[in-house]
Amino acid sequence: MAIGKRLKKAREGIDRTKLYPLADAIKMIKERAVSKFDETIEVAINLGVDPRHADQMVRGVVMLPNGTGRTLRVGVFARGAKAEEAKAAGADVVGAEDLVEKVQNGNIDFDRCIATPDMMPLVGRLGKVLGPRGMMPNPKIGTVTMDVAGAVKGAKGGSVEFRVEKAGIIQAGVGKASFAEDKLVENIKALADAVVKAKPAGAKGTYVQRVAVSSTMGPGVKVEPGTVLA
């Protein structure tokens, strides 16, 4: 009940039928992020695509200019020199057959997964485990690569993977409530720009249809798409 009352109070002053400029929406969200922890600021982008069709899938990775405020644990599937390269770059978990076995047993001690191309026949066995978690390495988003150092540093430095969900929505954390407003605006615009660049050939009509921002415990605020894409 207390949470319901808090959310109701947080919604005061927000016109749920209105589209706000991005900067105004961020200010409103930050003012209402009053939890004892540093809430994550999240963005939801509704796209004019049907991801059930292969030619309308949208996914990619973007480096947010101001980071995410979150420290990711990175796992790397690699052998030999590439394994050492991953460790030197700051990977938290590095392995080959041994790491595959751990993951198969349900021991997933990382948030982002990277693999060298030669490891994919092994890693492919983990599709049923990593796939539903959105963690399966994929060359299209740079997580199957020989540049393991670059991929690890990117994951640690604020790169965000995005993928359209069944309802045609992309959701991503773009920073913390403690971030300055202009830093959050920059991060959201960087994400939106990457989503636009990832527009599939099969998309018809208006691509970016709706945008909303929210905090972990707070209400959503609808945003004028034009102020995000400008």
Swiss-Prot record:
Pfam family, any one: Ribosomal_L1
InterPro entries reported in the protein's UniProt record: Ribosom_uL1_bac-type (IPR005878), Ribosomal_uL1 (IPR002143), Ribosomal_uL1-like (IPR023674), Ribosomal_uL1/biogenesis (IPR028364), Ribosomal_uL1_3-a/b-sand (IPR016095), Ribosomal_uL1_CS (IPR023673)
UniProt cross-references to PROSITE patterns, sorted A to Z: RIBOSOMAL_L1
GO BP terms, alphabetized: regulation of translation; translation
Domain of life of the organism encoding this protein: Bacteria
One cellular component term from this protein's GO annotations in UniProt: cytosolic large ribosomal subunit
Key words, A-Z: Repressor, Ribonucleoprotein, Ribosomal protein, RNA-binding, rRNA-binding, Translation regulation, tRNA-binding
GO molecular function: rRNA binding; structural constituent of ribosome; tRNA binding
NCBIfam families attached to this UniProt entry: rplA_bact (TIGR01169)
Function: Binds directly to 23S rRNA. The L1 stalk is quite mobile in the ribosome, and is involved in E site tRNA release. Protein L1 is also a translational repressor protein, it controls the translation of the L11 operon by binding to its mRNA.
Protein family: Belongs to the universal ribosomal protein uL1 family.
Subunit structure: Part of the 50S ribosomal subunit.
PANTHER family (alphabetical): 54S RIBOSOMAL PROTEIN L1, MITOCHONDRIAL (PTHR36427), LARGE RIBOSOMAL SUBUNIT PROTEIN UL1M (PTHR36427:SF3)
HAMAP family with a match to the protein in the record: Ribosomal_uL1_B (MF_01318_B)
Descriptive protein name: Large ribosomal subunit protein uL1
Organism the protein comes from: Bradyrhizobium sp. (strain BTAi1 / ATCC BAA-1182)
Lineage: Bacteria, Pseudomonadati, Pseudomonadota, Alphaproteobacteria, Hyphomicrobiales
